[in-house]
A protein has these predicted regions:
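Conserved ABC ATPase signature
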Residues: 25-28, 32-33, 242-301
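Walker A/P-loop NTP-binding motif
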Residues: 38-45, 275-278, 306-309
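ABC-family P-loop ATPase nucleotide-binding domains
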Residues: 205-208, 212-246, 251
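Helical segment within the ABC ATPase nucleotide-binding domain
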Residues: 300-312
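Conserved H-loop
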Residues: 316-325
Length: 422
């Protein structure tokens, strides 16, 4: 749980970190701030440096402390409250870096899950293995239901305390220390980074540049990709994206061309297509802002289909959106899940209904994984964050108001043109 006393314009609000976080509302209220804040908690569990800095700040040097370890005992004790306070401060530093804004003001309070003890004890045990006179001495560390064996004399850049702490947190929060392998960010205006030499000024685009560098150079893992997701991406792209000699290429039935010559929509979606082909998306966390960017309304709905496949695959996601088309479709897919549950004893009936609706029955989205938050402006100009009842769907009140205003103004203009009155 994160309590926000202040974060930019956001004040006196609370959010609970969930597998999928969806933020909507008018522009300028802080959706990106919240998405980055939520992504931070996945990023820090994968980053080998940040928690290591916390361990170093406490003066816990494993190499020095090792000399005093005998048989078994307690190595260190981490105060949960102290670590939560450190997380709150480090999160603000992270956001300042991501936004290139050292003046960003923030005050947070963070609470880790209740099943993590208030005092996190790290125990050690000496272990001697091997033949007589050729023994190898190891230290085994125990913390948060995990064990880590370190051979005497081994040197790692990350403290064994930090390494075990990170993976213990993953185990306790996500259910298995193997459930998070990497994190990726996809900011707004993603396309130009694929084709242009851009020097990022913000941490957000610096991380995105590293994201596309990484996924552009790893080998494909087709065995981890569902055919359903592959077909959806091919349909929305109307082709296929690949890399060759460090260049991004777009191929269709009419031939192959540099991605720089493809439509803006293709360049925006291309990194997602590569991510799907080259990572195990069930074990990654992904921040994606404005997935609907540069897409026709029909393709905005298709993007909701694609992200529903990510959700069902187990991807941890933080999403911001301005699109009522995207949200409407997501609501449809959540209702489709409810329909599938109604006919859980009669799957043939469910499939028949889907066929009549001309919708893929596999697209129903696991709505219980989603937490949706609506950002709105208070009378004093600050931003309020309100959790939505996902059982009723994701609301799009701000979009409805814009549509009503547009219809009303359009009607009055036409009326004035017709008879000179309003």
């Amino acid at each position: 749980m994160v309590y926000i006393k202040q974060l930019g314009a956001i004040k006196d609000s609370a959010i609970e970190i969930s597998p999928v976080m969806l933020f909507s509302g008018e522009s300028g209220l802080g959706k990106s701030y919240l998405a980055m804040l939520c992504h931070y908690f996945f990023y820090i569990l994968q980053d080998a440096k940040r928690i290591n800095r916390y361990i170093e700040s406490k003066g816990w040097n494993f190499s020095e402390m090792r000399n005093s370890f005998r048989d078994t005992g307690v190595a260190i004790t981490i105060s949960k409250q102290d670590f939560e306070d450190w997380l709150a401060a480090d999160c603000i530093s992270y956001l300042q870096w991501m936004l290139n804004n050292e003046g960003l003001k923030g005050e947070l309070s963070i609470r880790l899950p209740n099943d993590i003890d208030e005092d996190i004890v790290v125990r050690y045990e000496e272990e001697i293995l091997g033949l007589v006179d050729k023994e190898d001495v190891y230290i085994k560390l125990y913390m948060l239901d995990l064990t880590y064996r370190i051979k005497d004399g081994s040197i790692e850049s990350e403290s064994p305390f930090a390494f075990l702490f990170r993976h213990g947190l993953i185990q306790n929060i996500l259910g298995d220390f193997k459930n998070l392998e990497d994190t990726f960010v996809f900011p707004p205006s993603r396309g130009p980074m694929l084709t242009e030499e851009i020097i990022p000024k913000t941490g957000l685009y610096d991380r995105y540049k590293k994201t596309i560098h990484k996924i552009g150079r790893v080998n494909p893992h087709p065995e981890t990709v569902s055919e359903n997701l592959r077909r959806l991406l091919s349909k929305i792209l109307e082709g296929k994206v690949d890399t060759k000699d460090g260049e991004y290429l777009y191929s269709t039935e009419h031939g192959e061309l540099p991605i720089s010559a493809a439509a803006a929509s293709v360049r925006e979606i291309a990194p997602l297509a590569l991510l799907v082909e080259r990572t195990n998306i069930s074990k990654v966390a992904m921040l994606i802002e404005e997935p609907e960017a540069h897409l026709h309304p029909i393709k905005q709905r298709m993007m909701a289909d694609i992200l529903s496949c990510f959700i069902n695959a187990g991807t941890y996601m933080q999403i911001t959106t301005h699109s009522d088309y995207f949200l409407r479709r997501l609501n449809e897919l959540m209702d489709l899940k409810k329909l599938s549950q109604r006919y859980i004893e009669n799957t043939e009936k469910y499939v028949d209904i889907c066929n009549k609706l001309q919708i893929n029955s596999a697209l129903s989205v696991e709505y219980n994984k989603i937490s949706a938050y609506l950002l709105s402006r208070r009378n004093d100009g600050t931003t309020q964050v309100t959790k939505q009842d996902i059982d009723k769907g994701v609301p799009f009140a701000s979009f409805s108001q814009a549509i009503d205003d547009s219809l009303c103004v359009g009607f009055n203009i036409k009326k004035y043109l017709t008879d000179g009155t309003i």
